From Swiss-Prot:
Keywords: Ribonucleoprotein, Ribosomal protein, RNA-binding, rRNA-binding. Part of the 30S ribosomal subunit. The lineage of its organism: Archaea, Thermoproteota, Thermoprotei, Sulfolobales, Sulfolobaceae. GO terms for cellular component: cytosolic small ribosomal subunit. PROSITE patterns: KH_TYPE_2 (PS50823), RIBOSOMAL_S3 (PS00548). This is Small ribosomal subunit protein uS3.
Length: 229
């Protein structure tokens, strides 16, 4: 009887290796992730990218090569590859990290490129974002620069549910630049409490002792008339 834990562990390792291979080969295509699904007729591989055409290639040539690599190197049975576009790429941390790394390799100033990426992320509806660029930014000594806006969770239950984190590498003349992008997805925050406004109720004003005041005033008038007489 096969070991169930070992079986799923091996499948997870294969998926991680495929993900690392695709991230290394197709970071220019804004690679976002992969899903490996077992089907009765083989293995279905779904690749998400910001630029699917760069992975597909002319006439689907790259897909045929990928199918051979998945079958021979990673041991997938009859791989069926599907390449699809990413929904809301500005809210995908890996896509934005690769975009920022490509911008740095093209010669954009790191601070300007980071501000542009941050603006695109926040305009897409993110609750918060954090961008960290490390390397020999301005001097020969390596350092890092951080840009943060909005809400970014560092721990707790919200970290796994709402945070998307990715790391990319840019190869420049001064050396290797590291890029880290953290995005807080626009989901419902569990620890946020909104107080309901109480319905406005018209205030009732009650007037008392009106009759007593009138009687006392009449008595005082009669008394003053009697004194005059």
């Amino acid at each position: 009887m096969p070991n169930i834990k070992r079986y799923f562990l091996e499948k997870s390792i294969v998926k991680v290796k495929i993900d690392e291979y695709l991230a290394k080969q197709y970071y220019n295509a804004e690679y976002a992730g992969v899903e490996v699904l077992k089907t009765p007729i083989g293995t279905r591989v779904i690749i998400y990218a910001g630029r699917p055409s760069m992975i597909i290639g002319r006439g689907g040539r790259n897909i045929k090569q990928l199918a051979q690599i998945f079958e021979k190197v990673f041991g997938l049975e009859n791989p069926q590859i599907t390449i699809t576009n990413v929904e809301n790429p500005e809210l995908n941390a890996r896509v934005m990290a690769f975009r920022l790394a490509i911008a740095l390799e093209k010669g954009y100033h790191f601070r300007r490129a980071a501000f542009i990426s941050m603006r695109r992320i926040m305009n897409a509806g993110a609750l918060g974002a954090e961008i960290i660029i490390s390397g020999k930014l301005t001097t020969e000594r390596a350092r890092y620069e951080k840009l943060k806006e909005g809400i970014v969770y560092k721990s707790g239950q919200q970290l796994e549910k709402m945070i998307d984190r990715a790391i990319a590498i840019a190869m420049l003349k001064p050396g290797i630049f590291g890029v880290e992008v953290v995005i807080t997805k626009p989901l419902k925050i569990e620890d946020k409490i909104n107080l309901k406004e109480s319905p406005s109720v018209p205030q009732e004003v009650s007037v008392t002792n009106v009759t007593f005041i009138e009687e006392s005033s009449q008595k005082s008038e009669e008394k003053s008339e009697g004194e005059k007489e």
